[in-house]
Amino acid sequence: MVRLPLQCLFWGFFLTAVHSEPATACGEKQYPVNSLCCDLCPPGQKLVNDCTEVSKTECQSCGKGEFLSTWNREKYCHEHRYCNPNLGLRIQSEGTLNTDTTCVCVEGQHCTSHTCESCTPHSLCLPGFGVKQIATGLLDTVCEPCPLGFFSNVSSAFEKCHRWTSCERKGLVEQHVGTNKTDVVCGFQSRMRTLVVIPVTMGVLFAVLLVSACIRNITKKRQAKALHPTAERQDPVETIDPEDFPGPHPPPPVQETLCWCQPVAQEDGKESRISVQERE
């Protein structure tokens, strides 16, 4: 009694497995619906209605600001990505019906993740470090320590380590050794320094003496003009010999003198004019 129902159940499963209908095999751009193979909607379109025995798959284009990038059976389109400038993003390429908007970081920043949802400023290489790889929109700056013989004295996202200055090539001597943050300090040799300083000092002294002499000469000329003004031009005095006239000769005029026996200057031309009148 118990074995009969079990045997019936076993044979029922066996017959069902043997006579089951094979699964519907659809193409790459199709999908199965009720034993039918319906066409997928192309990129840029969404599914409205599945196909039937009498109609094909019904699709509709995505709206403005939407897209679908693959063959699909989606009921809704995806919205274009928004490039938020407050997060350091800008649009690299506008989205279409079948492509999404592409965002990149603004100049001087890079993505914080592989999805580039936000950006952050490039790192600076501190003094003592140089830029090994300049940052891009996706990757940050890569820094490396300056090796022996090189230095970097700035914080920069672009500057590499610079080689120490060669004092020997410039004909100088090294006065201070360079570090990874400072360059070598070069200077003149002691003898060379003397040869340079002496001519420069003599040139400066000569210039000072020349200027002093010029100033002294100009001062003397001004003082001489102030003490000896130009004498006024005087009329010539006619000299008359008394022996040229007959008769008694009058006594010679007495010349007046001032204190300290200085003669009084006669007024120009009077005596000569009187003598001429008497002669006439």
Curated annotation (Swiss-Prot):
Its main location: membrane. It is found in: Membrane. Residues 1-20 form the signal peptide. GO terms for cellular component: CD40 receptor complex; external side of plasma membrane. Keywords: Disulfide bond, Glycoprotein, Immunity, Membrane, Receptor, Repeat, Signal, Transmembrane, Transmembrane helix. Glycans are attached at residues 153, 180. GO terms for molecular function: signaling receptor activity. Residues 216-280 are cytoplasmic. The chain crosses the membrane at residues 195-215. It is a single-pass type I membrane protein. This is Tumor necrosis factor receptor superfamily member 5.
